[in-house]
């Protein structure tokens, strides 16, 4: 290899052109940048990056090839009070690295220093960036582009979804390959979901605290390398990218979209006591929100917060998103703690990152879903994200649980949430699909645990049950824990059925947590982020097949109802919806606010949802005409009903006219 040529300032990262590699690194406050390359024995050779255009340092290494391991040492001031923490003793990952070798260990050499710099060299233990050459045959792949009105999202963990699946080859269980295997594709099609939303697949690390406890970060919300696939779920690190793309291609052929959960709000460098392995050492002041005392604004609860209003960090975030769309053909993103994306530092709908995404022809046309909060002041922003974002609707989640798992909730509040929370989302030209309705998600109780536990049971997490929310709106139906007498089990079943029907027959975009259609339980753990074990892995052999069939039938029913698939707001008299009482009369003002939980919802003038959320069997008079129960509510004997449905306690039934 020769000394570096000046090279080019773009594209960002390490780019192989067939003759060598061009390297670039953004740092506005650095005084010198060294490229460090490593041979197969770990010997290091350093080169100064000779070029600088604006704040991008660059150089070209002729003869360098894919597989080259590299990192950076960045020189500059150590001025913690001003937010500068340069320390050339620390080898740093390329923020644009497409592959990373090594894990982020809990090791003292990875600490950059607190008040004073730690000058011990960390190259022997630091993870290293790896140059790749990217060639992939997408064949005739095409994005499904499912309309929002027909979208049904299935949230799943790559490993947990398939690790225990007995029909998959042993060697691919819990991997990217399994996602596109015919067994899984057939299951997704049978269930009826249209989009697979994956918990983070970008390479992540386990926090030092978890490593000391013998636990791991299972969910993946501790990002280490935003452009690199997490290698643990691949046959080898070298094949991870192609195996993931193979899965995307197989899912697309079946008409199933792939949405990635992505973490742009913080990094695995954590607080000032965390490891220094990338952004902190490259340009701490630019990449993170820094307080006046030089410490971090911790609006994420993870120790640091990315400054997504800084122009170069906005560019970094957008390039990351474009990479996943253009290189991996993903169909959208769910943004973790997405209020951080709009901080300037206060939340603004016209924040720089939002404006950049909206202006991008690649990003503005994929599905964008916000988790519309963070833990900072003014962080709760449900309903306030600009188009084209959809948002997780926690109003729906809480209202559905409070309605069916006895709590105080008016019929009016329930109806509002059933109608895509128009009071929250009907603004700025947004459609009902902007409300992503959910009962459960990866964080919180599973659906089965919602009907089996009144209290969280997170002792296995090692925090003496202090972690996880206490606001679960759950009901154990008289006994804490799984199991119980037959009548209790039947009441729990009825509650699950009612909740699933509410989710899948409401206006908006439904999201189903993987395993809820099986009856999966985490035994009351509502924060299983560090449980990479049978607590979180779906047990397919113990799956409740009847519940799976029930769920699939609900999804099929949903796709038959124009009022739900049209993705337009319901207006009085438009034929989409009528709200009726138990006597088939329009609900009175008093019934909206003070009446019992008895109602009928007539959709598209031919589908009737009869609801009895009281604790008593109640007769419900159906509207004039002939009605027949439809699957999954129809039994073998399915007579026409012309007058009264005897609604069981906590019961719900759907009828079709004629």
Curated annotation (Swiss-Prot):
Lineage: Bacteria, Pseudomonadati, Pseudomonadota, Gammaproteobacteria, Enterobacterales
Keywords: Carbohydrate metabolism, Glycogen metabolism, Glycosidase, Hydrolase
Cited PANTHER family: GLYCOGEN DEBRANCHING ENZYME
Residue(s) at site: Transition state stabilizer: 443
CDD domains: AmyAc_Glg_debranch (cd11326), E_set_GDE_Isoamylase_N (cd02856)
Active site: 336, 371
Name of encoding gene: glgX
Enzyme Commission code(s) on record: 3.2.1.196
Pathway: Glycan degradation; glycogen degradation
SMART domains xrefs: Aamy (SM00642)
Example GO biological process: glycogen catabolic process
Identification of the protein by name: Glycogen debranching enzyme
